[in-house]
């Protein structure tokens, strides 16, 4: 089974999926970005001990994508933007369509949390989040975040944080500002997720066209290869059902924290 994110909008459904996967003895892969070249190199640096014992990690994950009209454009008397209709308009030929409104934490949180899980090999125990609706009218109308920051307490005394948002297509020359900062007892590293990349500029270039293009990106191929190897050898994929469930639990805890303004324990 290969599934796109989010794993589910309910933690109970994630648990049901795990039970079904294990009962039927099948393999499950939750789609992720962990095979991007810079991320692989960062993982190798951490595993080699180059920065010593891992103490802290931070991820900036800002997608430079639009989500319909910007915040503040709805006129008095206009009806709220319908979530499903907006998703159908944006994703007519691909996935990510659902009737339940979700903020960026739920839609894209798998990616930065997937990095944190892979690089630290630790579970998140407690979170504190602040969320806002800063950019897009559809998020305002449906009461979901498009910008958030989350503080994390992990196993082994590791602390972490992430910032996530959907910040508009004209805000960045690449798909977004996505960087991972890792601090250890002997030093630190900064991983620019987009590298390697080339910049392309030409006359009369459309203003919303990404100027930077990624190269040497075999993430999709490597994910499928990893899944095929799991089927052939019996090993677990890079992000299996239990790993996906733990990430979902962290997301749900962060959403709750953003609503209550209080730290929330993550249910494992």
Identify the residue ranges that each predicted region occupies.
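Structural detector of well-ordered beta-strand residues that form the stable sheet scaffold
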Residues: 2, 27-29, 58, 128, ...
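Beta-strand-loop-alpha-helix segment that lines the small-molecule cofactor/substrate pocket
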Residues: 1-34, 49
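C-terminal helix-rich "cap/oligomerization" subdomain common to oxidoreductases
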Residues: 13-15, 23, 229-268
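Predominantly a Rossmann-like dinucleotide-binding segment in NAD(P)-dependent oxidoreductases
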Residues: 34-140, 261
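Short polybasic amphipathic segments
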Residues: 180, 196-206
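Contiguous beta-strand/loop segments that form the cofactor/metal-binding neighborhood of enzyme cores
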Residues: 107-195, 221-233
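Short, well-ordered coil/turn segments that N-cap beta-strands
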Residues: 26-27, 53, 156-158
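A general structural signal for well-ordered alpha-helical segments in protein cores
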Residues: 14, 39, 112-113, 220-225, ...
